[in-house]
From Swiss-Prot:
Plays a role in virus cell tropism, and may be required for efficient virus replication in macrophages. It comes from African swine fever virus (isolate Tick/South Africa/Pretoriuskop Pr4/1996) (ASFV). It holds the Pfam family ASFV_360. GO terms for biological process: taxis. This is Protein MGF 360-4L. Belongs to the asfivirus MGF 360 family. Signal peptide: none annotated.
Length: 375
């Protein structure tokens, strides 16, 4: 049962009763629990977003209802917890973040399952991944050591590695990351991979020390929108030749490779990097690594103008068994730059058009060269 005070707040907030307020009202609004961030609390019933002052639903600092609940629980704001649940927030998210026994009891009274802390954590993590709820996940797990410690250490890392390889997560880390950083980078990577603009902007604002890492991750995942934004709007600059190896390591990463090339990276060096990766050394022996996605990157570098006719590259290409057409093209001396890629363009939408056209004509282009040569 909700108190008259909570129900009154609900009606007043939904009707935007505090949209025009005087400075003298601030203290009263704060004491009544009607202040959120830097202004009176607001709520959009259509978007299910909690706002502050004149903030719009699309503002980077606006909160989805479940995130607002998590924040209120962490601050033990009893009336707001009740209010957010009344609007439809999932109280099970709240019990995970309760720091006091009193708040935990309140969450249970509002409908939280007390067994959730024992049996629901794993499924919650997986569900958040499926729904790409990056900011909610970070609000729940980041800096919530008591919850992170409920995960068995081995199971916790296996869970994350099962979905994404840890290469990009451990980028530039000289020692094992603490769980907080591990979780943060994991969810940040999801935001970049799926180009979730609001989470990316929110996280980049909150964690500016990860700017270089963010740019590298965007290159690795081929997110040209984020590369362009970081490089030209935020002036986060790294040497294109340092970024290119990251682009090359992600299978079929034409967007990332092209963008580094357009920024000035040496495409011959990129091809050499790929060949070294294919011929990686294990226990003193050269092990031939055959992966279609990596070979796709090799072919793309050649299409961008890399020279495939050096001794080391020749030896590797002749060992290629899966891509027969590429091997045949090499033997006939027909691996060459693709005419559509001769321009260096940096506008993301135009880059996507070029790559789309290239992918449409790539196989036809190769077969045409081979057909003409065999006549």
């Amino acid at each position: 049962m909700n108190s008259l005070q909570v129900l009154t707040k609900k009606v007043l907030i939904e009707n935007k009763a505090f949209s025009n307020y005087h400075e003298d009202d601030i203290f009263i609004l704060q004491q009544l629990g009607l202040w959120w961030h830097n202004g009176p609390i607001g709520f959009c019933k259509q978007c299910k977003m909690v706002t502050s002052g004149s903030m719009s639903c699309s503002d980077v600092d606006s909160y989805e209802l479940d995130r607002a609940l998590v924040r209120a629980v962490k601050k033990n704001q009893t009336d707001l917890i009740k209010l957010f649940v009344l609007w439809g927030a999932n109280i099970n998210y709240g019990i995970i973040c309760a720091k006091t026994e009193r708040t935990k009891v309140l969450c249970i009274q509002l409908g939280a399952d007390p067994k959730f802390l024992d049996v629901g954590l794993y499924n919650l993590f997986v569900d958040l991944i499926k729904q790409q709820k990056v900011l909610l996940a970070i609000d729940i797990y980041y800096d919530n050591i008591s919850i992170l410690d409920r995960f068995d250490s081995h199971d916790f890392y296996v869970l994350i590695d099962f979905i994404y390889n840890c290469f990009i997560l451990n980028l530039d880390e000289k020692e094992k990351m603490i769980k907080n950083t591990y979780v943060l980078k994991f969810w940040f990577k999801i935001a970049i991979e799926f180009n979730l603009i609001k989470p990316i902007r929110f996280l980049s604002k909150k964690f500016p020390h990860l700017d270089d890492w963010r740019l590298k991750t965007a290159v690795y995942l081929g997110n040209v929108d984020e590369i362009h934004h970081a490089y030209f709007q935020e002036n986060i600059r790294l040497d294109p030749n340092d970024m290119m190896p990251l682009a090359c390591m992600y299978p079929q990463n034409k967007l990332g490779i092209y963008y580094c090339f357009a920024l000035g990276a040496n495409i011959n060096t990129a091809l050499e990097t790929l060949i070294r990766y294919i011929n990686h050394e294990v226990n003193g022996e050269i092990t031939f690594f055959s992966n279609y996605g990596i070979w796709s990157n090799v072919h793309f570098c050649i299409s961008l103008g890399a020279n495939p006719y050096t001794k080391k590259i020749q030896e590797t290409l002749l060992r290629q068994e899966k891509n027969v057409i590429m091997k045949l093209l090499f033997r006939k001396g027909l691996l060459s730059p693709h005419s559509i890629l001769h321009k260096k363009i940096l506008e993301p939408s135009e880059v996507r058009k070029i790559i789309s056209t290239y992918e449409y004509t790539e196989t036809f282009h190769s077969f045409s060269l081979l057909r003409d040569n065999l006549r």
